[in-house]
Amino acid sequence: MLGPISYFHFDYFPAIFAVAAVAALLYGRGVLACALAAAGATVKVYPVLLIPLALIELWRRGGARAVAKGVGAAVAVLAAVLGPFAVVAPHGLTWALHVETARALEVESVGASFFAFAHALFGVHLHVVLTSGGSHGIAGPGARTVSALLAVAMAAALAAAYVRYFLCARGPEDLVAAAATVVVVYIVFSKVFSPQYLVWLIPLVLLIGGRRGLRASALLIVILAVTQIFEPYNYVHYFRMSTPWVAYVVFFRNLLVVGLLGLLVWPKPLEQHAQQLDPDRASGFG
């Protein structure tokens, strides 16, 4: 669905762990879900976002003792995988973390696409650099400010998603939708948005049931199709900021991803009715 990009990256592996963690939760195996999510996080960090959902389910079914088991399983997996690297090459591990956290605002990210759009439409000057991670980013105080604001917004949006799930979730569809939501939140507010990140969404969005699931799946297909307009063959024109229409396409694609987030968090009619009956019990984005 992403053309040549999907053949040269390993994002399928964390996606498999993530969907396996969701499947474990659907079958009531919260501790296993924590372990699977932690294993996926050692490949790409995003599956760790599923652990709070698993802990919520463990709390509902077994209280603090079950939560402790879930946390223990996640920590054990992380220690088993990352522990040897921390012992053999601690500086290498900390350097890898530094490289990831210090990266510039990647040009395809939602935040950077606003800069690119302004450059294409109004001629706003941009300073694009090659980052240590091999991607292209926007440098400068404005980009750093946007990166910081995105980090705060991500933390707030994730917290809201978890609170909403804790207060309002009623069944398997809500669990799958919550899992997809936190991953989309991560993509929207991250300072990096590589096209292969969309692989993460495919299994989660397709699992969502009902009309919301159909609409979300249709929108995701459109997002994948639009991404192929500029990736990989027109990407060079984009990071060089030499072809305005490519910047417009990237901006439009990112607006669609934001729209996907809006679709996932929009209250269902039943949830809206619950808010009217008991506003203290029902909570969420909407």
Task: Give the residues covered by each predicted segment.
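Multi-pass membrane glycosyltransferase architecture that uses lipid-linked
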Residues: 1-96, 143-286
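Aromatic-rich transmembrane-lumenal/periplasmic boundary elements in polytopic membrane proteins
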Residues: 78-121
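Membrane-helix interface motif
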Residues: 87-88, 118-128, 233-236
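Juxtamembrane membrane-water interface segments that cap and precede transmembrane helices
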Residues: 123-142
